[in-house]
Amino acid sequence: MHHNHQEMQDCIQQCWDCRTECQETLFNHCLEVGGKHVEKEHVKLMMDCIQACQTAADFMTRGSALHTSTCAACADVCEACAESCERIGGEEMKRCAEACRRCAESCREMGKMKKAA
């Protein structure tokens, strides 16, 4: 299975959207609200998601032959982050979880693909 340029561009955009949503939610909501929003494991997952999305987008933008591996890893991280956000609950966390799930779905598909020759 090969990817096309548009599929990759869409995945890159999903990664950037997820990264932005997680970063804004973490800094503009979680750190303001406190409590369960700033529990160590949740904050680490959000930071992991921010970094994984950035890395996957960077690999795809460069056309790295290893982008499928980073996309597969990004999908796993995004799923874990979405689950954590859903456990916390609330409208902001729901939006973040939705962005994570969209990115995970896109990255999971990209992770299954091989670069066209």
Please place each PLM-identified region on the residue numbering.
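Amphipathic alpha-helical hairpins
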Residues: M1-A117
